[in-house]
Amino acid sequence: MKFFAVLALCIVGAIASPLTADEASLVQSSWKAVSHNEVEILAAVFAAYPDIQNKFSQFAGKDLASIKDTGAFATHATRIVSFLSEVIALSGNDSNAAAVNSLVSKLGDDHKARGVSAAQFGEFRTALVAYLQANVSWGDNVAAAWNKALDNTFAIVVPRL
């Protein structure tokens, strides 16, 4: 998985302050509403932060409009969204905490090897949240659940970078 498995970033931690079942349900239901838009999610991230696009050798330096409809772009977007979907599906159940920790730790390790910074994870987070806000029913409760999930994820990922 590439830098964008970073999306996992987006996902649900299980460490310091695990998501409650209600918080996990909010994250899961809002994610379900957009998770079929893999290409649009990745395109939104790249449009907001071209430095992230440039971390991918197959997309670096290319016009987003020229790559967005390619098979390579769709394949990569699907990998990222699938990773996020896996982590999100595991959230809200204490018995899955070790699995979430393992997945998110590997994400951090893999992205350290690619030279991805904590700041770039922050950019990804910002772009993902903006995409969610524009495309799902977004209230204070959903925002709080996603912020907690992402904070938990960062608590695992950032020390590994």
Curated annotation (Swiss-Prot):
Keyword tRNA-binding: no
CDD domains given in the database record: Mb-like
Origin superkingdom: Eukaryota
Additional notes on this entry: There are at least 12 different components in Midge globin.
Keywords linked to the UniProt accession: Heme, Iron, Metal-binding, Oxygen transport, Signal, Transport
InterPro entries given in the database record: Erythrocruorin (IPR002336), Globin (IPR000971), Globin-like_sf (IPR009050), Globin/Proto (IPR012292), Mb-like_M (IPR044399)
Disulfide bond positions: none
Species: Chironomus thummi thummi (Midge)
Family: Belongs to the globin family.
GO molecular function, one term: oxygen binding
Segments forming domain Globin: 18-161
Descriptive protein name: Globin CTT-VIIB-6
Positions with a binding annotation for heme b: H76, H111
